[in-house]
Amino acid sequence: MDIGKLVTRRSSEHPAGAFLFEPSVLIPFERAWRDQQLWQQRLFEEPSSPEAVWILQHPACYTLGRGASAQHLHFDPNEPPAPLHRIDRGGEVTHHLPGQLVAYPVLDLQRHTPDLHLYLRQLELVVIDVLRDLGLQGECLPGLTGVWVGRCKVAAIGVGCRRWITQHGLALNVDCELQGFAEITPCGLVGHQVGRLCDWMPGLRVSDVQPLLRQSLAARFHLAWIPQA
């Protein structure tokens, strides 16, 4: 399968309106998670409601997926170095922090393609598109989820989905500090190095990458951002 040819059911000539939330301050993980849950519930109750996407940064924290193993934590979970959250996404442990862009699409996959595997591949392509715009070559590794540049993983992906409505999403390391990743085995992948885009492009900042991520999400999922009053 050529994932580069994956498309959604929605025509790019008729993009659907979606709300885009881009707070200018760091958003605690639990607040962003609550907002996604509320929007997911809104789509359950009002199926014709617009979809929504959050692009933001978190203060330092760690999250564990539904079935994630505590063996990938290199600290006592009762005394974590930063807040630790057990959440309703797939995947193992990951680290969020300033300098990392996260994108949380709350989409109704029945409006796109109701296939979680394809949705994960689309999120990877969102990141690969951004890297291409920056002149970097991103790639996926067989059997693994995420995006690598060279031997370094620069983007982690983990989603939750109920009744085909998604939450959680992707985390792209731009100019974040990497020390906190040493406290875990990121995504449960032993021997895989974590990287950040500024390692290849010194001086690159989140503000440089965020417009590209916004553009790639809109293009891949055929979304038109609804102006907010």
UniProtKB/Swiss-Prot annotation:
Which keywords does UniProt give here?
Acyltransferase, Cytoplasm, Transferase
Q: What does this protein do?
A: Catalyzes the transfer of endogenously produced octanoic acid from octanoyl-acyl-carrier-protein onto the lipoyl domains of lipoate-dependent enzymes. Lipoyl-ACP can also act as a substrate although octanoyl-ACP is likely to be the physiological substrate.
Enumerate the active-site residues. Answer: 187 (acyl-thioester intermediate)
- Could you name the domain of life of the organism this protein comes from? Bacteria
Q: Which organism is it from?
A: Synechococcus sp. (strain CC9902)
- Annotated compartments: Cytoplasm
* Top EC category: transferase
Q: Which residues form the BPL/LPL catalytic domain?
A: 47-225
What lineage does the source organism belong to? Bacteria, Bacillati, Cyanobacteriota, Cyanophyceae, Synechococcales
Q: Which PANTHER family match?
A: LIPOYLTRANSFERASE 2, MITOCHONDRIAL-RELATED, OCTANOYLTRANSFERASE
| One Gene Ontology cellular component annotation held by this UniProt entry | cytoplasm
Q: What PROSITE patterns is this protein classified in?
A: BPL_LPL_CATALYTIC, LIPB
Q: Which family does it belong to?
A: Belongs to the LipB family.
Q: Does the record's keyword annotation contain Repeat? A: no
GO MF annotations, alphabetized: lipoyl(octanoyl) transferase activity
Q: Which InterPro entries match?
A: aa-tRNA-synth_II/BPL/LPL, BPL_LPL_catalytic, Octanoyltransferase, Octanoyltransferase_CS
The EC number(s) attached to this protein equal 2.3.1.181
Catalytic activity, reaction form: octanoyl-[ACP] + L-lysyl-[protein] = N(6)-octanoyl-L-lysyl-[protein] + holo-[ACP] + H(+)
Q: Which GO terms describe its biological process?
A: protein modification process
Which NCBIfam families does the entry link to?
Answer: lipB (TIGR00214)
Q: What is this protein called?
A: Octanoyltransferase
Pathway(s) it belongs to:
Protein modification; protein lipoylation via endogenous pathway; protein N(6)-(lipoyl)lysine from octanoyl-[acyl-carrier-protein]: step 1/2
Record-annotated residues binding substrate? 89-96, 156-158, 169-171
**Primary location group:** cytoplasm
- What's the further remark here? In the reaction, the free carboxyl group of octanoic acid is attached via an amide linkage to the epsilon-amino group of a specific lysine residue of lipoyl domains of lipoate-dependent enzymes.
Q: Where is the site Lowers pKa of active site Cys?
A: 153
